[in-house]
Amino acid sequence: MPQARYKPLVDRLAKDIRSGRLPPGTRLPTHRQLAAREGLALVTATRVYAELEAMGLVSGEQGRGTFVKETALYAGQSIDLHSAAADMVDLSFNYPSLPGQAELLRVALRQLAGSGDLEALLRYQPHAGRLHDRAMVARHLLRRGLSVPAEQVLLVDGAQHGIAITLMALLLPGDVVAVDALTYPGFRLIAQTQHLELAPIAAAGAGPDLEALEKLCRQRSVRAIYTMPTMNNPLGWVMDLPRRQALVAIARKYGVILIEDGAYAFLAEDPPPPLATLAPECTVYISGFSKNIAAGLRVGFVAAPLPWVSKMERVIRATIWNTPGVMTALVSSWIDDGTVVRLEGEKRQDARARQRLATEVLGPLPRVGHPGSYFVWLPLAEEVRADRVAVALMREQVSVSTAQPFATSAHVPHAIRLALGSVAPDALRLALAKVRRAIEQHTDC
């Protein structure tokens, strides 16, 4: 079809969607129907819908068809942190904080200001961090069941940066990475910028379908597996020991790198050992202090096999040179005096209290989650569209996430993810009531 006819069709459909002439939720003609109606080749009709999907105007749903999306939702929802209105209750992003943390920071900064090595913190630091600070993080990791020497710990600018340096140091564009079909959006974002191919693995209970994973490894040259075995985001599962051992066996059999994300692992009480303990020779363990202490610190860490450390150091040098010494010194002092352990314990209690509140307020709504996590996954009935629920809640001054940012496959389930850790309990109760009401109203439509 000549481009003069092809582009105007895309423009016309886009205009109809943006103007509301084709309202959100409208089922569009099938590819064959569109081709017949417009006199197109089937491949051209497919291209029309692909362009509309790239513009964020439609979504193709396997087995259901192509639907008009809610355009009121901002792009990259739950990946990009936007400045919210003062009266907006944010259930899309987790940045848990406890009363009194600001005073802890004041005290710690005064102590740091009086320390003897303050001038040293104003200089450039080693790319992987000062050895003293790395040793403190290694000590912290012992509480997670992971024993590594300080030389194998690298300090980074938050766990997100830890993921980035791992992918940049160990993988090449075009490499295949196995991931959960629903996973942390930040990983997907970095993988896209590095031009990696994500191969989604469906869930099977509390973890990925390992039969499907092994089949993938037999058929494709899988370079890495990214997983959150302890407090998966967004589903909250904690893999049991046999499943972890089976996952490790697959990685070893096929020579695959394991990338273990432990961002929320501190919330689990007595979890099985990390994958990095079970397979230290092929596992990179990534976590940070944003969730267990405060998001504004932006201090994370990577524990990696020794042969990979120098590659990662070079990437740290290329991206940030070093993590700010003042921040790493602050974290080290809080590890040393027990503040981190205390805050983690208090946040475990806080997360469980918020989960109990969610159970009480959400009532009979189907949900998936862990009693100790800071998030809840709400699968919706087949006739309910998640984007319409999300827009309705935005009008009620409540921000939530749909499944779209978490999905790594073409099949995007209609579901809502709630982040419970960022608002005061009273505001959370009111917001959860609005969520329940919005879902029930759309279910009854």
Question: What does each model-found stretch correspond to?
Answer:
Residues 63, 149-150, 369-375:
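Short Gly/Ser/Thr- and Asp/Glu-enriched loop/turn motifs at secondary-structure junctions
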Residues 23, 59, 284, 400-401:
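Short beta-strand(s) of the beta-wing in winged-helix/HTH DNA-binding folds
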Residues 120-254, 265-284, 441-443:
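Conserved core of the PLP fold type I
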Residues 285-370:
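PLP-dependent aminotransferase class I/II
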Residues 303, 377-379, 419-421:
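Short hydrophobic/aromatic beta-strand micro-patches
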Residues 1-113, 122, 317-324, 345-353, ...:
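N-terminal basic, amphipathic alpha-helical segments
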Residues 262:
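Walker B catalytic acidic pair
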